[in-house]
């Protein structure tokens, strides 16, 4: 049974580490993992004495050197519970029903520029009428300056009154009394004191926003207050989520910049909110989000291209400094996300390491990579159910490896799936066409093929000395 003196020893270690300005990321992560495991596994254990729980809470509060932190961390023994914050509703109508997606924005007063209104406008303008029924937007005006908040609320209500009335837009504020100490914090990474205060408060801003949004929808996407959206971004997100049904994931990424476009299950938001609060002064928010993903056992980044969200602010919310970061994978105009129906994939090519066949068929930014193929080698997709295909697009090679394309190949479609000892396969194939410069694209397939398609096959027509990357296979169905 877990002894309290062991827990006390852990806190002593943590206390010593707090005095070290220069410490490795590895040591921090080690302590972080141990701390979370003990807190989550042992404090939740029904056999831990209530008195010990109280001592643990008092010790953790002392470690954070903040009497005002007691109410925030009183529920550490239940990471799935909500943080006790009484929010101020600055502009909102009661949420009548749970939505599919909540879009969360946190905003503070900037020394230069203000992009919040443009961001909200982009969210609504880039969504169809049907999509608007499935989203809610929550704006956390997190600045402690009440005059600025009042002015922003007036602007928001004037421009987006109908969205507020429809329950699609809520503007909230978490009062300053709920915040931990923000002055005199540790200067990790030799950051200046004002930057440490800024990023630490930002972590708490987002923690309170996540806490509020935990029950408003099935999924939650995190944006900044200076972002432009792609057309019909919700439809694209829904297709991606559907394609990952049955797959474990914690975070899906729809932008490669900071914490823009990070998507979560809403049931994970309470844990994430607690996590940001616990380590609010340790590091920037995007770093903490990466650690959170890893602690919940999602090893690899799952990012999708093209990006759905673009950073548009020129001046940073920190000191008004210039911030010219852009996501070069962003596409603003509507793009057609493929359907890629459920299928099994196999190849007789020599696969390199873990670049397996399935990665070419996924929406994730990954690919298949094989050693030089020979005449007659195949890459086969067998669909779970017969489909009618409208369009096919296959791309090989990458920008970095432009020679690793299919130099000589064809694309076939098949019918009459036959069972076999090793795998299902089609008995007959019909050739649709040849690859040109490593790519294949054809529309109107359903007008050319007289049967429902059971299989699709990439066929190597000539041996090549170059390796082969199949970057993406996209299929649109009728």
From Swiss-Prot:
Q: Which cofactor does it need?
A: a divalent metal cation
Q: Does the keyword Metal-binding apply?
A: yes
The pathway it acts in is: Protein modification; protein glycosylation
Membrane topology qualifier: Single-pass type II membrane protein
Q: Where are the transmembrane segments?
A: 24-44
Q: Which PANTHER family match?
A: ALPHA-1,3-MANNOSYL-GLYCOPROTEIN 4-BETA-N-ACETYLGLUCOSAMINYLTRANSFERASE C (PTHR12062:SF14), N-ACETYLGLUCOSAMINYLTRANSFERASE VI (PTHR12062)
Full protein name: Alpha-1,3-mannosyl-glycoprotein 4-beta-N-acetylglucosaminyltransferase C
Q: Which organism is it from?
A: Macaca fascicularis (Crab-eating macaque)
């Amino acid at each position: 049974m877990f002894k309290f003196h062991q827990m006390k020893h852990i806190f002593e270690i943590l206390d010593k580490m707090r005095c070290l300005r220069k410490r490795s990321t590895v040591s921090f992560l080690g302590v972080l993992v141990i701390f979370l495991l003990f807190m989550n596994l042992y404090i939740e254990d029904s056999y831990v004495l209530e008195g010990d729980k109280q001592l643990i809470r008092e010790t953790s509060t002392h470690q954070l050197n903040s009497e005002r932190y007691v109410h925030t961390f009183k529920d550490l023994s239940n990471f799935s519970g909500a943080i006790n914050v009484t929010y101020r509703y600055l502009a909102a109508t009661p949420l009548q029903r749970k939505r599919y997606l909540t879009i969360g924005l946190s905003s503070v007063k900037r020394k230069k520029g203000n992009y919040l209104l443009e961001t909200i406008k982009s969210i609504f303008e880039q969504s169809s009428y049907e999509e608007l029924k499935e989203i809610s937007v929550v704006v956390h005006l997190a600045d402690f300056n009440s005059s600025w908040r009042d002015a922003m609320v007036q602007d928001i209500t004037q421009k987006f009154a109908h969205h507020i009335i429809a329950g699609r837009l809520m503007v909230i504020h978490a009062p300053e009394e709920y915040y931990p100490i923000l002055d005199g914090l540790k200067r990790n990474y030799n950051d200046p004191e004002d930057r440490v205060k800024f990023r630490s408060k930002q972590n708490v801003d987002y923690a309170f926003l996540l806490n509020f949004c935990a029950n408003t929808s099935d999924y939650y996407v995190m944006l900044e207050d200076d972002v432009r959206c792609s057309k019909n971004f919700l439809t694209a997100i829904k297709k991606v989520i559907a394609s990952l049904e049955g797959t474990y994931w914690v975070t899906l990424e729809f932008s490669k910049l900071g914490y823009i476009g990070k998507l979560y299950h809403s049931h994970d938001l309470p844990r994430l909110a607690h996590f940001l609060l616990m380590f609010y002064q340790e590091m920037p928010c995007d770093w903490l989000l990466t650690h959170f993903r890893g602690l919940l056992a999602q090893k690899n980044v799952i990012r999708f291209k093209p990006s759905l969200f673009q950073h548009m602010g020129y001046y940073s919310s920190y000191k008004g400094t210039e911030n010219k970061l852009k996501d070069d994978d962003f596409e603003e105009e509507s793009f057609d996300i493929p359907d890629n129906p459920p299928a099994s994939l196999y190849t007789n090519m020599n696969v390199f390491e873990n670049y397996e066949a399935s990665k070419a068929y996924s929406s994730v930014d990954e690919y298949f990579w094989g050693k030089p193929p020979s005449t007659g080698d195949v890459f086969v997709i067998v669909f779970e159910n017969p489909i009618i295909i409208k369009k096919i697009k296959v791309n090989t090679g990458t920008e970095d490896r432009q020679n690793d394309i299919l130099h000589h190949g064809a694309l076939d479609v098949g019918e009459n799936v036959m069972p076999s000892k090793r795998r299902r396969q089609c008995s007959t194939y019909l050739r649709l066409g040849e690859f040109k410069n490593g790519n294949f694209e054809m529309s109107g397939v359903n007008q050319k093929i007289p049967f429902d398609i059971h299989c699709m096959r990439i066929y190597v027509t000539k041996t090549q000395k170059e390796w082969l990357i199949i970057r993406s296979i996209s299929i649109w169905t009728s």
